[in-house]
Regions:
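N-terminal, intrinsically disordered, polar/charged segments of Gram-positive cell-envelope systems
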Residues: 28-97
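Generic N-terminal leader/processing signal
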Residues: 1, 5, 25-27, 83-85, ...
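Gram-positive cell-envelope targeting signals
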Residues: 1-35
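Well-ordered beta-sheet/strand-loop patches within structured domains
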Residues: 28, 57-63, 70, 81, ...
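Feature for intrinsically disordered/low-complexity regulatory segments and propeptides
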Residues: 99-111
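Generic structural signal of hydrophobic/aromatic residues within well-ordered alpha-helices
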Residues: 38, 42-43, 97, 101, ...
């Protein structure tokens, strides 16, 4: 009896399937098409002909999207509206959107094709909740403690677009009146405190001694160092000593002191400024800066090794270099204890750089120049007749070369010749008491 009943039930089910298939449109031939039609029938049974409605909860607020009919301005638009069921009820739209997703289209594209006003709704919400990130900021105070003040960065926030369309799709597949909570994602800042911290490494430090200089020359060295102090260079930015320090004039604060003109020491405004430029030049070399312009004096200065001086003259000779470190560079130039000091801060150097001065050839030192102190400028009145005093040492002419040695993990990996120079001889000066 049970077997007979089972056979009757199976036969009836088979007949029902055949009859259902016979009444389907002719174009539905595949299993996928059959599934799509089943979705459409299910949607019609559940949703009827309601319009889609979406309520979004975010930041303690709610806003609602209600599907609206769109008027067609021309035949082409009318065709698009019809094909995408833009003005249809929810049941047809939900089924069509699901078909698109099943065929590999993204949920956003599948929804927007039938709901063209949905993106502007999403953008409106996004603008209301979006908060831009705040980068970490760094202030350089060269003479302060600490030298660098770094603020913390803050993440921004924005609506998660992908999650929005995914949630809308899932909600509208369940019901024409959907409620979702808007998901958000963080926007990272472009610059973090850690990024700024990496740019505070002491890249190089160099100093020269000016303690035995005269009062006016000391003033000029110190003034020039003050004028270059606090310089900041972005990656790729160039520095000009003359542009930064300005004209060597009384109006610009400079005094008269010894300068080199035509191979002789004479009085002139700004004497000593070349010691400031030389100090800065050497620190720039050690910091890995790309030196664009630097030249030697006619006479070898006593405060630095040959081929490592940087003579400057406003309007003609300059010290120029470019920051090519991959980050910002901060320059601190100052004077302390009779020394001119230049420090470069920025990202850590790839190499430890060492200077090397080589004297290629050297001539004979010229005979000293003798001055009789007829006016009593150098000796006290009670000084013994015939007393001698040296007021300037002499030096021979020389040819020199400057090299930079690059060390990595304690090993010299390359050597680079940067310049070759010729220096004139310097006559020593002796003063005699008549």
């Amino acid at each position: 009896m049970k077997n007979a009943f089972g056979k009757i039930f199976a036969t009836a089910a088979a007949i029902a399937i055949v009859l259902f298939a016979a009444f389907l449109p002719a174009e539905i031939k595949t299993a996928r098409a059959f599934s799509d039609k089943a979705d459409e029938i299910a949607s019609e049974r559940i949703f009827g002909d309601q319009k889609s409605c979406l309520t979004v909860c975010y930041s303690g607020r709610t806003t609602t999207y209600t599907d609206e009919e769109i008027a067609a301005p021309d035949h082409e638009a009318e065709y698009e509206i019809h094909e995408n069921k833009i003005n249809s009820g929810h049941r047809e739209k939900a089924a069509l959107v699901k078909q698109r997703v099943n065929r590999g289209l993204s949920k956003k594209c599948a929804l927007v094709a039938s709901y063209p006003l949905l993106p502007s709704f999403f953008e409106k919400i996004s603008r209301e909740i979006e908060r831009l990130p705040k980068d970490s900021e760094m202030t350089f105070s060269p003479g302060g403690q600490p030298k660098f003040i770094i603020t913390r960065e803050k993440n921004g926030i924005k609506a998660d677009e992908r999650a929005f369309y995914s949630d809308v799709f899932a909600a509208w597949q369940r019901s024409p009146t959907a409620v979702i909570t808007l998901k958000t994602e963080q926007i990272p800042p472009a610059v973090t405190a850690a990024d700024n911290k990496k740019q505070t490494f002491l890249k190089a430090r160099f100093c020269t001694d000016y303690s035995r200089s005269g009062k006016n020359r000391k003033h000029n060295v110190e003034l020039a160092m003050q004028k270059t102090d606090g310089t900041e260079l972005s990656d790729g930015e160039s520095f000009s000593f003359n542009k930064t320090v300005g004209r060597r004039s009384g109006e610009n604060g400079f005094y008269e002191a010894k300068i080199i003109v035509g191979g002789e020491y004479v009085d002139g405004l700004g004497g000593g400024v070349c010691q400031a430029s030389t100090t800065l030049y050497n620190a720039a070399l050690l910091a890995g800066m790309n030196v664009d312009e630097a030249g030697s004096h006619t006479l070898a200065p006593s405060y630095v090794a040959p081929s490592f001086d940087a003579a400057v003259s406003y309007g003609s000779r300059d010290l120029k270099f470019t920051n090519c470190s991959g980050g910002r560079v901060f320059i601190h130039t100052y004077c302390s204890g009779g020394k001119a000091i230049a420090e470069f801060y920025g990202v850590e150097n790839k190499y430890h750089i060492v200077r090397k001065s080589v004297v290629v050839s050297q001539g004979e030192a010229p005979e000293d120049k003798l001055i009789i102190d007829e006016e009593g400028k150098y000796f006290a009145p009670d000084a013994e007749e015939g007393s001698m005093m040296r007021i300037r040492g002499g030096s021979a002419s020389l040819v020199s070369e400057g090299y930079l040695l690059y060390y990595e993990s304690g090993k010299c990996v390359k050597t680079r010749k940067i310049r070759s120079d010729k220096y004139m001889p310097v006559r020593g000066i002796l003063v005699k008491k008549p």
